[in-house]
């Protein structure tokens, strides 16, 4: 199980009561996605649904929450370069190694874990999403950029 620094645990312990809507020192299982994200994790919607379903109807203490937090922290899914490359290659209709910047923006905002427009802008502004003069992006470079974190 992933370890968390004591300072982060203390910070979470201080913030945990903000989600306690009944004053019993516990949170609803349905709130887990919000709580996880507020404490710096970014689980996928599918992960949140799975966790919430497993804890449906339950009230969770801080210790219960901390165990879930550690579990999610330890299983953060990161795709491989090959996963990103092959996924983006599907949009290279002409086999040039390039995809339309507009199409890439659309894919990032509408498929899988949907990104906000601000998140898409941030990704595209980074080194890997630079569009050429024709508005195309080299998806090999973009996939490598994604792997940098």
Curated annotation (Swiss-Prot):
It comes from the Eukaryota. Residues 7-42, 79-114 form the EF-hand domain. One of its GO terms (molecular function) is calcium ion binding. GO terms for cellular component: myosin II complex. Keywords: Motor protein, Myosin, Repeat. Myosin is a hexamer of 2 heavy chains and 4 light chains (two regulatory light chains and two essential light chains). This is Myosin, essential light chain.
């Amino acid at each position: 199980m992933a370890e968390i620094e004591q300072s982060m645990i203390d910070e979470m312990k201080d913030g945990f009561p903000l989600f306690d809507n009944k004053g019993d020192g516990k949170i609803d299982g349905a709130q887990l996605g919000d709580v996880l994200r507020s404490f710096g994790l970014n689980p996928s919607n599918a992960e949140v649904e799975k966790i919430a379903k497993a804890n449906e109807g339950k009230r969770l203490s801080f210790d219960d929450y901390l165990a879930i937090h550690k579990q999610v922290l330890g299983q953060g899914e990161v795709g491989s370069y090959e996963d990103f490359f092959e996924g983006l290659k599907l949009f290279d209709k002409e086999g040039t190694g390039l995809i339309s910047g507009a199409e890439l923006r659309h894919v990032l905002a509408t498929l899988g874990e949907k990104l906000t427009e601000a998140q898409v802008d941030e990704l595209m502004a980074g080194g890997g999403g630079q569009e050429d003069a024709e508005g195309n992006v080299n998806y090999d470079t973009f996939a490598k950029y994604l792997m940098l974190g």
